[in-house]
Amino acid sequence: MAAEEEDEVEWVVESIAGFLRGPDWSIPILDFVEQKCEVFDDEEESKLTYTEIHQEYKELVEKLLESYLKEIGINEDQFQEACTSPLAKTRTSQAILQPVLAAEDFTIFKAMMVQKNIEMQLQAIRIIQERNGVLPDCLTDGADVVSDLEQEEMKILREVLRKSKEEYDQEEERKRKKQSSEGKMEEPPIYTSETAKLTNSQGDGEHFVQPSSEVKVHFTNQSVQPLARKMELLPETSSLTQKGLKIPGLEHASMEGPIANLSALGTEELRQREHYLKQKRDKLMSMRKDMRAKQIQNTEQKGKPTREAEEMTEKPEMTAEEKQTLLKRRLLAEKLKEEVINK
């Protein structure tokens, strides 16, 4: 009994593998994946569009599998048992069953679609290169231009920061010197005012009030002078902002010119790339559709004589055991044929 069950599971696995290799499965699945993979990118965030496409894919897989299993006489329990058997755990079987597993696992589905999107882009670029000999400027020069501009921008920013730090340090040094000199000059009036208060309390106020006022006026004039100097220095320190970060002695140290056009240039290059690749990708997909349509037509034409012969030599209906035996023979013949061809 155990041997019979193992044989049955092996037969189910082999029949499903044969179906997944055939055109009835691979052509509609590949058409769907190639048409829908364009929106998939390698980001952690999953968009709502991804979920909708996954649901469409799941419905397509269920429809194809259901029609095949019904035709061959395999029920759902046998199918589940075959998918969980050790025969289905091998590397070859897992690669064949990946499109089926992707219908149930969104992570596998997304990885499959991202990989197909990258493959389609690389194929489009390869076709362009084979036809023209070289790639167009929009697919080669854009990255170099952006990197050069970024390097130039970093040089300018470093120079600006260095110059600004030097000017800031110089300004702070001037302030410290002025504060120390002002502190030294302010010490006598404090002493004089205290003396004036003491003498004023003793009754000689009129004699000392006049000197204190003179001292006050004198230091008021002194305090106006450093303020005027600070006002004169303001245009020098603010000139970087007013002149677009132009530093004296550095002709190239400016944020204008190519850096100002960085964002516009990058956007235009990316737009050209996207448009160019989309055109070639559409051509590639149309070529593949034509090839698959011819393949389906050829398989149908090859199948017609055998169907007519079967109808002409109609035999009584076979039993389930005879069907299984016949299917095993066919699968064995196909397997031997593949091994001979591969050798």
From Swiss-Prot:
Q: Where in the cell is it found?
A: Nucleus; Cytoplasm; Cell projection, Cilium, Flagellum
Q: Where is the composition biased (Basic and acidic residues)?
A: 301-323
Q: Which residues carry this modification: Phosphoserine?
A: 85, 147, 201
- Top-level taxon of the source organism: Eukaryota
UniProt key word Membrane: no
Q: What is its main location?
A: nucleus
Naming one, the record's GO cellular component terms include: motile cilium
Give the coiled coil ranges: 147-181
Q: Which segments carry the region annotation Disordered?
A: 165-191, 286-323
Keywords from the UniProt entry: Cell projection, Cilium, Coiled coil, Cytoplasm, Flagellum, Nucleus, Phosphoprotein
Tissues of expression: Widely expressed (at protein level).
Name the family the entry cites: Belongs to the CFAP36 family.
| Record's function text | May act as an effector for ARL3.
PANTHER family according to UniProt: CILIA- AND FLAGELLA-ASSOCIATED PROTEIN 36, PHOSPHODIESTERASE HL
* Known partners and oligomeric status: Interacts with ARL3.
Supply the name of the protein. Answer: Cilia- and flagella-associated protein 36
Taxonomic source organism? Rattus norvegicus (Rat)
